[in-house]
Amino acid sequence: MMLFFSSLSDWFPGVSVFRYITFRTVAAMLTSGLIVFLFGPSIIASLKLRQGKGQPIRADGPQTHFKKAGTPTMGGLMILTGIVVSAFLWCNLSNIYFWVSLFVMLSFGMIGFYDDYLKVTKQTEKGFSGKARLSLEFLIAIIAAFVLLQVGSSGLALPFVKDYFINLSWFFLPFSAFVIVGTGNAVNLTDGLDGLAIVPVMVAALSFALIAYLSGNINFADYLQIHYVSGTGELAVLLGAVVGAGLGFLWFNAPPAAIFMGDTGSLALGGLLGIVAVATKHEIVLALIGGLFVLEGFSVVIQVGYFKLKKKRVFLMAPIHHHFEKKGWTESQVVIRFWIISIVLALVGLSTLKLR
């Protein structure tokens, strides 16, 4: 649709606004949000009917979680539908970065969907084999990184440093795959409480929409002395759709949640954030902006690793949001405080664009 309206600009001057990334980003945000908001109730009703008992609740989890039994999962289907429809309406479909990002998002979403499907149908906490799932994720990430390498550089930009890049050479592929897969699974681990994951995802998406826009604009990139990557500005439109869909989803995911995002949504959105960070050369900044996801992910790694070594636990329960629940925080306290942390970390991450 964007290209159609742009072609009319010679006859209708006002239509030229469709060429602007900023306008299309806002339009994509509104479109995806409206789609999720309008179609959400029917999707939730359909999923609830098909899933019966809904997502299994962890037996060792906080007692307050047992009242969530019967809540349907796979809410990521709502989010992805809103994003994809909006993106096809407002994005430049000839942009390679758009297609690579869409490939990662939908591929990770399919893996998450299969995982959710197994959990719901078998009523077990264990879904897709961990090794098989990670293998597929790394394969997808390597393919995406290889495509990016063909159209860009293998350089790694450092925050707070002007015009200095580390040439990763062949190591770019495994490094990029680690960023993409790591982000996808970190977001997945964060999604454990009503509304907990979607707001930090929106905060990170909005932050990277700005980064993508600046990195893809040669004038802004030169002024800020950040790596210029031609074409990445289009990712701002895609991320705008993510923010809008996230807002629409939050309407239904706010406590008490009518639906859970599930692996379908968390893996897809995390993978998307990872590939955007790689494309814009802001992988390290992602660790700052998405610091909450890093914290959640490392809490699990530390818990599992320490238990294998010492047969003891560092946290009362992992991921770390459950630790604070066990300490006596209410679910709302954990969620809102973690939201605050994600916003503060995003501001710190964005400050690296200027502090050089």
Curated annotation (Swiss-Prot):
Membrane topology: Multi-pass membrane protein
Cited InterPro entries: Glycosyl_transferase_4 (IPR000715), PNAcMuramoyl-5peptid_Trfase (IPR003524), PNAcMuramoyl-5peptid_Trfase_CS (IPR018480)
Catalytic reaction annotation: UDP-N-acetyl-alpha-D-muramoyl-L-alanyl-gamma-D-glutamyl-meso-2,6-diaminopimeloyl-D-alanyl-D-alanine + di-trans,octa-cis-undecaprenyl phosphate = di-trans,octa-cis-undecaprenyl diphospho-N-acetyl-alpha-D-muramoyl-L-alanyl-D-glutamyl-meso-2,6-diaminopimeloyl-D-alanyl-D-alanine + UMP
Keyword line: Cell cycle, Cell division, Cell inner membrane, Cell membrane, Cell shape, Cell wall biogenesis/degradation, Magnesium, Membrane, Metal-binding, Peptidoglycan synthesis, Transferase, Transmembrane, Transmembrane helix
E.C. number(s) listed in UniProt: 2.7.8.13
Main location: membrane
Recorded GO CC terms: plasma membrane
Localization of this protein: Cell inner membrane
Pfam family for this entry, one: MraY_sig1
GO biological process, one term: peptidoglycan biosynthetic process
Its biological purpose: Catalyzes the initial step of the lipid cycle reactions in the biosynthesis of the cell wall peptidoglycan: transfers peptidoglycan precursor phospho-MurNAc-pentapeptide from UDP-MurNAc-pentapeptide onto the lipid carrier undecaprenyl phosphate, yielding undecaprenyl-pyrophosphoryl-MurNAc-pentapeptide, known as lipid I.
PANTHER family named in the record: PHOSPHO-N-ACETYLMURAMOYL-PENTAPEPTIDE-TRANSFERASE, PHOSPHO-N-ACETYLMURAMOYL-PENTAPEPTIDE-TRANSFERASE HOMOLOG
Entry's family note: Belongs to the glycosyltransferase 4 family. MraY subfamily.
Protein's name in the database: Phospho-N-acetylmuramoyl-pentapeptide-transferase
